[in-house]
Amino acid sequence: MKVIKTLSIINFFIFVTFNIKNESKYSNTFINNAYNMSIRRSMAESKPPTGDGAVASAGNGAVASAGNGAVASAGNGAVASAGNGAGNGAGNGAGNGAGNGAGNGAGNGAGNGAGNGAGNGAGNGAGNGAGNGAGNGAGNGAGNGAVASAGNGAGNGAVASAGNGAVAERSSSTPATTTTTTTTNDAEASTSTSSENSNHNNAETNPKGNGEVQPNQANKETQNNSNVQQDSQTKSNVPRTQDADTKSPTAQPEQAENSAPTAEQTESPELQSAPENKGTGQHGHMHGSRNNHPQNTSDSQKECTDGNKENCGAATSLLNNSSNIASINKFVVLISATLVLSFAIFI
């Protein structure tokens, strides 16, 4: 009888320790699986969409287009033109170029910034208006030419010169600081230089082609618009100097044709920088990050079907629960059996 008692007691402790080990093992795997799933979800959700494409487009593309051609016009010249009188003067006299350029460029550019205003104003305005009106001058040199013209004398001077007269004008800048005014009698040219920024040799013919001289109008236009045509003609593709004899009204269509590629050249940075500012790269990265979540869940499901209990997700937690329940049932049965045997032996 004593032997049976001792064996029953030993059996009881053996099964108790065995079941405790099994329970601890299953509980540890369950905790590890839950911890691994939480880590995976946190890592998958903590990955932000990368904004490299949009940052490069907004940082490099728009800054380059607004920085080279249009920041100078909107920053220095167009602010002064809208403040002093380029809104009415250049709006009426400069036709469409300074009307759209100084009107929209300085209005929207000084109001909203060089990105929108200088992009539309200096791009469209200087491309179409000043490109066709001033030949190739302000089309290529919209950065410096339009600045000085709008800053110094854009009240009434830009009305006459940029409207009709600048089509038949050619100017060449000479680095001098004196002020000289000469008027010829043979109806060829009138030359005046301004000592404010730099000097210009400016020749103008009558649109009728009869050889009459308009010295007062030429002097007025060259004094008010000496800064308009300073850096613009040096950057154009036409020769710097040209006599008044060759400037018949038939030369105006050629100048308008020469201004057309400059308008396309000034509008080309906008066309290049416009699709970059849409930020389509961010949407692509965002959709990619959204599509990563079902991929992780599918991988976890594959690992669960393969039988890897360490990398398994929520499906194995159910299996662990069922195995835990089965082990608990076994544990209860063994305890009850040992208790019955012990009571039977002691009784």
From Swiss-Prot:
Biological role: May play a role in the merozoite attachment to the erythrocyte.
UniProt name for this protein: Merozoite surface protein 2
Prosequence residues removed at maturation: 322-347
Localization terms from the record: Cell membrane
Signal sequence range: 1-20
Glycosylation sites: 22, 36, 224, 296, 320-321
Domain characteristics, as noted in the entry: The N-terminal region appears to be involved in lipid binding.
Cysteines paired by S-S bonds: 304-312
Organism: Plasmodium falciparum (isolate Nig32 / Nigeria)
Lipidation sites (GPI-anchor amidated asparagine): 321
Ranges of biased composition (kind: Low complexity): 165-206
Keywords: Cell membrane, Disulfide bond, Glycoprotein, GPI-anchor, Lipoprotein, Malaria, Membrane, Merozoite, Repeat, Signal
Region of interest called 16 X 4 AA repeats of G-A-G-N, as start-end residue ranges on this chain: 85-156
